[in-house]
């Protein structure tokens, strides 16, 4: 069984592959590769209670291989990608399961350039996790040391603020920030406050168990309510490791990643020579025609931050992102950074002198239903059983420029099912029929329905 998915290693804490023995061996495997480049690895995490166990196991494996480990404590994933470059480290490691509940944890790995390691290196690490590495252990004199990196939070805050135009301030703007009780709990509000905003922060009291629980980008209802209560100009919701952002405008209307990307594309096209952008297969079909109207070439990648980055590098894209809220601004970041993306949105509002609802109003996503379906039987078996029904669905949706996506998640035991098309009634009907068929096949009903 492979331990790497679409975004590193992820699973139930204290259960393979996130059990202490496997994580220790993963630390050794990472150390074996890191020492080919240098002697330092920087290590950050989110706020899950299992982070202590995972951190200890990884550190033991790394120092046993002769690698020094700089501990960052709770920090956004993008902060590790930034600091690995800033500190000239060999690799950066993040302990996080992103938007998952506290029950899960994971490990993400960046190379010395702050880019997620390629599939080929994942395969090497996977092989070495299973290999006998005792002969590769460092001699006692050569074992690594562990130290805390002082000032890392302030250094990252200054980096994020540096992506905001120097002539602009957030004075007079009221912002609600939901930090999801996660890695940015002590950073999210500070960034906007230091730039002059009146900031209302929620989801900033982590206890190890409440990360992403009824808060953050997956549960933005609290943010929406607070925006309306406070009369705020905008609401910004992060996830557990602050690599995705979901926004609501001053009217409390939610804005997804596609709308954020569309707004940034439009602004950059009007002010800069942006020619190319990237999204994943999960993005709305209507964003393709929107990009064409702007004169921007839009490229699609497979789902996942690494695939998106590869596509952006291949086509020299200025901006890329996913519907889920992962936004990459290549001028500033090598991975998705919710705080950098949020500042980009705020700068557009200020430079265009428009409200949040106005800057997102141009792009209208195609009507869709998105369901996340838990499953227990083998996915390939489900795919074979549902195949004929999917063919019928695709034929029906083809009449309304629609499509169906039926894929397994690379980070959770869920099937991602998306039905979209220009006729919202047909989309809803097809989604219901597909759900009925899945129930007949013994697959659980979908959760978290989304209609746009």
UniProtKB/Swiss-Prot annotation:
PTM Phosphoserine: list the residues: 98
Q: Which GO terms describe its molecular function?
A: magnesium ion binding; phosphoglucosamine mutase activity; phosphomannomutase activity
Q: Does the keyword Magnesium apply?
A: yes
Q: Where does Mg(2+) bind?
A: 98, 239, 241, 243
**Any one GO CC term of the record:** cytosol
Please give the superkingdom of this protein's source: Bacteria
Q: Which reaction does it catalyse?
A: alpha-D-glucosamine 1-phosphate = D-glucosamine 6-phosphate
Q: Does the keyword Metal-binding apply?
A: yes
- Biological processes annotated in GO: carbohydrate metabolic process; peptidoglycan biosynthetic process; UDP-N-acetylglucosamine biosynthetic process
Using the chain's own numbering, where are the disulfide bonds?
none
Q: Name one Pfam family in it.
A: PGM_PMM_I
Quote the record's cofactor note.
Binds 1 Mg(2+) ion per subunit.
Keyword set, alphabetical order: Isomerase, Magnesium, Metal-binding, Phosphoprotein
EC number(s) stated in the UniProt entry for this protein: 5.4.2.10
Residues annotated as catalytic: 98
Q: Please state the span of the N-terminal signal peptide per the UniProt entry.
A: none
Family named by the database record: Belongs to the phosphohexose mutase family.
* PANTHER family named among the record's database cross-references: PHOSPHOGLUCOMUTASE (ALPHA-D-GLUCOSE-1,6-BISPHOSPHATE-DEPENDENT), PHOSPHOHEXOSE MUTASE
Q: What does this protein do?
A: Catalyzes the conversion of glucosamine-6-phosphate to glucosamine-1-phosphate.
Question: Under which name does UniProt file this protein?
Answer: Phosphoglucosamine mutase
Gene responsible for this protein? glmM
